[in-house]
A protein has these predicted regions:
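Residue-level signal for functionally critical sites in structured catalytic/ligand-binding pockets
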Residues: 1-9, 30, 49, 55, ...
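Long amphipathic alpha-helical segments used for membrane anchoring, targeting, substrate engagement
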Residues: 1-18, 67-88
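N-terminal intrinsically disordered, cationic/polar leader segments
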Residues: 14-36
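A short interface-forming secondary-structure element
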Residues: 34-53
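Stable alpha-helical structural segments in soluble proteins, enriched in small hydrophobic residues
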Residues: 56, 60-71
Length: 88
Protein backbone atom coordinates (compact mmCIF):
# COMPACT_ATOMS: atom_id res chain seq x y z
CA UNK A 1 0.00 0.00 0.00
CA UNK A 2 2.91 2.35 0.74
CA UNK A 3 4.05 2.02 -2.88
CA UNK A 4 0.62 3.10 -4.09
CA UNK A 5 0.63 6.16 -1.82
CA UNK A 6 4.11 7.09 -3.04
CA UNK A 7 2.94 6.69 -6.65
CA UNK A 8 -0.06 8.92 -5.88
CA UNK A 9 2.13 11.62 -4.31
CA UNK A 10 4.48 11.58 -7.28
CA UNK A 11 1.56 11.81 -9.71
CA UNK A 12 -0.03 14.75 -7.87
CA UNK A 13 3.25 16.69 -7.90
CA UNK A 14 3.41 16.42 -11.68
CA UNK A 15 -0.15 17.56 -12.43
CA UNK A 16 -0.40 21.33 -12.87
CA UNK A 17 -3.76 23.09 -12.69
CA UNK A 18 -4.20 26.53 -14.28
CA UNK A 19 -6.97 28.89 -13.21
CA UNK A 20 -7.65 32.35 -14.65
CA UNK A 21 -9.72 35.24 -13.39
CA UNK A 22 -9.76 38.77 -14.83
CA UNK A 23 -6.10 38.92 -15.81
CA UNK A 24 -4.75 36.78 -12.96
CA UNK A 25 -3.39 33.29 -13.67
CA UNK A 26 -2.53 30.81 -10.93
CA UNK A 27 -0.68 27.56 -11.57
CA UNK A 28 -1.09 25.03 -8.77
CA UNK A 29 -0.05 21.41 -8.40
CA UNK A 30 -2.71 18.80 -7.77
CA UNK A 31 -1.29 18.60 -4.24
CA UNK A 32 -2.50 22.22 -3.85
CA UNK A 33 0.87 23.94 -3.85
CA UNK A 34 1.01 27.24 -5.71
CA UNK A 35 3.60 27.04 -8.48
CA UNK A 36 3.19 30.47 -10.05
CA UNK A 37 1.01 33.58 -9.99
CA UNK A 38 0.98 35.67 -13.15
CA UNK A 39 -0.63 39.08 -13.56
CA UNK A 40 -1.39 39.19 -17.27
CA UNK A 41 -3.32 42.46 -17.06
CA UNK A 42 -0.72 45.02 -15.94
CA UNK A 43 -3.50 47.60 -15.55
CA UNK A 44 -4.43 45.73 -12.38
CA UNK A 45 -1.21 47.03 -10.81
CA UNK A 46 -2.62 50.55 -10.56
CA UNK A 47 -3.35 51.57 -6.95
CA UNK A 48 -6.94 52.35 -7.93
CA UNK A 49 -7.41 48.67 -8.96
CA UNK A 50 -6.36 47.24 -5.57
CA UNK A 51 -9.77 45.76 -4.83
CA UNK A 52 -10.04 44.27 -8.33
CA UNK A 53 -6.70 42.49 -8.03
CA UNK A 54 -7.52 41.19 -4.55
CA UNK A 55 -10.83 39.80 -5.78
CA UNK A 56 -9.29 38.27 -8.91
CA UNK A 57 -6.51 36.64 -6.86
CA UNK A 58 -9.02 35.15 -4.42
CA UNK A 59 -11.30 33.80 -7.15
CA UNK A 60 -8.42 32.41 -9.24
CA UNK A 61 -6.94 30.71 -6.17
CA UNK A 62 -10.30 29.18 -5.23
CA UNK A 63 -10.78 27.91 -8.80
CA UNK A 64 -7.30 26.36 -8.85
CA UNK A 65 -7.79 24.81 -5.42
CA UNK A 66 -11.18 23.29 -6.32
CA UNK A 67 -9.80 21.83 -9.55
CA UNK A 68 -6.72 20.49 -7.72
CA UNK A 69 -8.97 18.75 -5.18
CA UNK A 70 -11.06 17.26 -7.98
CA UNK A 71 -8.00 15.97 -9.85
CA UNK A 72 -6.46 14.61 -6.64
CA UNK A 73 -9.66 12.69 -5.90
CA UNK A 74 -9.71 11.21 -9.42
CA UNK A 75 -6.03 10.19 -9.17
CA UNK A 76 -6.63 8.68 -5.73
CA UNK A 77 -9.45 6.53 -7.12
CA UNK A 78 -7.31 5.55 -10.11
CA UNK A 79 -4.12 4.66 -8.23
CA UNK A 80 -5.42 3.39 -4.88
CA UNK A 81 -8.54 1.77 -6.31
CA UNK A 82 -11.08 3.30 -3.93
CA UNK A 83 -12.92 6.54 -3.28
CA UNK A 84 -11.62 8.20 -0.07
CA UNK A 85 -15.10 9.67 0.45
CA UNK A 86 -16.37 6.12 1.02
CA UNK A 87 -14.25 5.93 4.19
CA UNK A 88 -16.26 8.65 5.94
Amino acid sequence: MYDKYKKLQDALKKIIIRAKENGIVIDMSAEQKVIKIDIEDVDLLQPSRKEAIETALKVAFEKAQAKAQEVAMEKTKEILGFDPNDLA
